[in-house]
């Protein structure tokens, strides 16, 4: 017979910290080359013009410019960076 009564509940009481995923720079925001635009798991949003993708699917700006989100087709979104003089 067990000499301890069911006291195992604290072993299951852990959780992992949030991963801080999501959009970091929104549409029409100015970005510098190298700025992270989206952190994501998988290609929820695809890279468009002047946007690079890291090995963890992070999207980042390749040039200075303004962020533009658009639809690639019905189910896919993409993000691009539009260059130009914007006074920043």
Swiss-Prot record:
Region (Disordered): 1-21
Gene Ontology molecular function: structural constituent of ribosome
One cellular component term from this protein's GO annotations in UniProt: cytosolic large ribosomal subunit
PROSITE patterns found in the cross-reference section: RIBOSOMAL_L27
BP terms from Gene Ontology: translation
Pfam family, one: Ribosomal_L27
SUPFAM superfamilies linked: Ribosomal L27 protein-like
InterPro entries registered for this protein in UniProt: Ribosomal_bL27, Ribosomal_bL27_CS
Family: Belongs to the bacterial ribosomal protein bL27 family.
UniProt name for this protein: Large ribosomal subunit protein bL27
Organism: Helicobacter pylori (strain J99 / ATCC 700824)
């Amino acid at each position: 017979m067990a000499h301890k009564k069911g006291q195992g509940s604290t072993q299951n009481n852990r959780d992992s910290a949030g991963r801080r995923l999501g959009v970091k720079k929104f549409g029409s925001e100015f970005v510098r080359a190298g700025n992270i635009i989206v952190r994501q798991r998988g290609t929820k949003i695809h890279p468009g013009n002047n946007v690079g993708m890291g090995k963890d699917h992070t999207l980042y700006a390749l040039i200075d410019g303004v962020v533009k989100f658009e639809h690639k087709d019905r189910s896919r979104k993409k993000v691009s960076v539009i260059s130009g003089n914007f006074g920043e």
